[in-house]
Amino acid sequence: MKLNPYVIFLVVSVVMTLACGNMASAQNQGDQPDIYEQAEQEADRLQRLLDLEDWQVFYVDSTLKHDFPAMMAEYDELRKAKVANQSMYQSVHDKWMEQIDNSYKKFFTQEQWTAYLKSGAARAQKAREKRKAKK
């Protein structure tokens, strides 16, 4: 049985969205790393994956430490407004992931950008474009 890549991506996106919501409540409990630690972990992962220079790691870390909390703030606004429409949460996620990718493209080399896309970012971008086209 072959799974539809769109369905897989949608499931992963929903899980990520729910995880972000749970992450905010878990911050108070100390169960999971906070949003800044997650940004550092992602910067470290990309450094290993893409062989980033120190200055590039700094920019990745700075980008994520700005954009992750901003995305979480938008999630909180939706949650406080008692929005139940999952597509609105997905739109917020897509907006911030697109902004992060645009930032990365500015300071990654062409080889790093290609490797980043091959690591799964290209699939995510295509899925975002499909969702955007449906609107």
Question: Where are these predicted regions, by residue range?
Answer:
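Bacterial Sec-dependent N-terminal signal peptides
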Residues: 1-31
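Charge-rich (acidic/polar
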Residues: 25-135
